[in-house]
Amino acid sequence: MITYKRHKEIDFKKWDNCIESAINRNIYATTWYLDLVCKNWDALILNDYEAVMPLPWNKKWGVKYIAQPMFCQQLGVFHHSKKLDVDDFIKSIPKSFLYVNMNLNTLNGKSKFSVKENTNYELLLKDHDTLRKGYSKSHLKNLRRATRHELVIANPCDTADEFSKSKRNLALDFMTSKQFELEHDIVQTSLAFSKGEIFSVEGNDGICCSVFVLCGSKRLFLLSSYSNEESRKKGAYFFLLDYIFSLERFKGYVFDFEGSNLDGVAQINDGFGAELTKYHTVKFNFLNRFFRF
């Protein structure tokens, strides 16, 4: 039986145990991460936490609605059985939520309520020489360029403040102040919980390229990155990801590129030999057709 529970009614220990043991587990569905990125979240729960579905919600003009949080690519239903029907959960969303627009996860498949198919790339990290054989000619060329410029990995001394400050200087046209603040909180909390790492490349005048990855359940999630002009000229981004892939401690992990639906970004991810995966967006609206969010 699927039941709806408000946030205060959720057993968070059972929830996190369910997520950790789910066949489609990811860090976005853990309680600490949901608490960071969601102003409010309730849940649908099958029996005694056999499967769970977070419901991130908010209010606008007095109307309760469900929407995908920022920095949280995939949610949906997390479960142990391969035979689960995601639409059983979607149809159990209380009618008090008059508008729903959220992403499922890859293993949820397509729903009757799907309105969009999204692109993602994942790479199983194995022997480094084997991985490199899957790189595109363009990526190998970028790595040779990085070698010619004698790029080096920076000492791991970046803090959340340093990372956010550097990115803000380079991405003002692409992110809002609210997004910068939330990203900073995620980086800071993840570092404190040992659930994230910052990797950087040293340039002529300090850090020229940096990435932040979330770490959990044998998966790495490429949550954020930035590159300056020097980085782009020297192939630092390719050099940095190749370095991460080479680390022995990550062998057997899955590296999640976090997209992308943008062709240019998708081509870069594909060039590392990553596997194309899909996930769906579901949407429905019980509001007046003239009411828009």
Model feature map: region roles:
Residues 1, 7-64, 174-186, 190:
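N-terminal charged segments
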Residues 1-6, 10, 110-177:
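Acyltransferase donor/substrate-recognition loop-hinge adjacent to the catalytic core
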Residues 103-109, 139-141, 261-262:
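Short, polar loop motifs at secondary-structure junctions
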Residues 87-89, 195-293:
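Aromatic (often tryptophan-rich) hydrophobic motifs at membrane interfaces
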Residues 17, 31-88, 203-230:
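Conserved donor-binding loop and adjoining core beta-sheet/short helix segment
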Residues 84-120:
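Non-catalytic accessory segments adjacent to catalytic cores
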Residues 101, 154, 254-257:
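Short catalytic-loop micro-motif centered on adjacent basic/acidic residues
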Residues 24, 156-208:
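Short, conserved active-site entrance elements at the starts or edges of catalytic domains
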